[in-house]
Amino acid sequence: MNILVTGNNGYIGSMLTKLLLDKGYGVTGLDTNYYRGCEFNSFHYPQLKQINKDIRALTKKDLENIDAVIHLAALSNDPLGELDVKLTYEINYEATVKLASLAKESGIRRFIYASSCSMYGIAGKEAVAEDSPLAPVTAYAISKVKSEEALSKMADENFSPVFLRASVAYGIAPMLRCDLVVNNLVGWAYTTGKIRIMSDGTPWRPAIHVEDLGLAYIACLECQIEIVHNQAFNVGQDKENYQIRDMASVVKRVVPGCEVEYTYEHDSDSRTYIVSFDKIATELKGFSPRWDIEKGVWQLYKAYKAHGLTFDEFTGNKYIRLNQLKGLIQKKTVDEKLFWRA
């Protein structure tokens, strides 16, 4: 079985590609490679077929001999999505619909879409399930809602989309990100001795280890198609819902000699949501998470220490997606629409 993984050289994609190849799948990766040279751990998969192309330039020929699609490629978080709202719409929504249409035309039935729990937006204190009202507050979250709606309308006996609404990922992957909350808190603790919280610490977020997230994609790929056909699944565990300040407390227990510091820079951030994961636990039997946040914080701390992560590296372009893209724009390596310049 040959799987097309878009965004395979990103944080989640680099982990998912490894997991798929380790299980014996054929994998074709498609990535525009904005983050080339930003590796945390060197990796090379000789059995991987790589297409170096912008998702917006995809053609039907790129889908030849593909049996299923896992679509990760996107401007990949809320701050990045606000860089250019129109561009976020073009890459995250329009390119997604185009890819799904080409996949359907090519007879590819399984289409697994990387959605996000961020679409719940401001959800209060009650746990939200897949059928709860959506309240996206950022361009990124809106693009996920619109993409789900469009792909759902395309579903029929020949095309079976499924929507994996991911919790906030954490943990070590070959293409590390330090702009995700747990990875970021550990980075501040390790490089400065201060666990820097930019809000008042009260917002809720669900968290999931990047490996567990990859395993969820594989469980979805391997289960009976009738179980996941045109379904949305929140991806995570009930016990992994945390307030930001509770995440910081875990980091404080693990990283020696650090203390919590509140900066209130993002005090206006209204996003908060507790998520129910009953559906994935009961219906996607192949999904069995291996991690929890404390285990993940230990992994991050040990990896940062072994790597010798410096403050400049941690806060620079390499592991912060928005910084890297701004750097490419400033150097005129990419144009204003994020296409590579010739």
Predicted features along the sequence, with ranges:
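C-terminal substrate-binding subdomain of Rossmann-fold SDR/epimerase-dehydratase oxidoreductases
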Residues: G193, M198-A342
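Active-site Tyr-X1-5-Lys
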Residues: I122, A135-V162, Y190-T191
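Conserved beta-loop-beta element that borders a ligand/cofactor-binding pocket
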Residues: S115-S116, E148-A173, N183
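Short alpha-helix in the Rossmann-fold core of NAD(P)-dependent oxidoreductases
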Residues: A74, D84, Y89-T96, I112-S115, ...
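N-terminal Rossmann/SDR dinucleotide-binding element
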Residues: M1-A68
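Conserved Rossmann-fold NAD(P)-dependent oxidoreductase catalytic core, especially the SDR/UDP-sugar
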Residues: V97-A139
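NAD(P)H-binding glycine-rich loop region in Rossmannoid oxidoreductase-like domains
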Residues: I55-I91
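Short-chain dehydrogenase/reductase
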Residues: Y89, E126, S132, V137-V145, ...
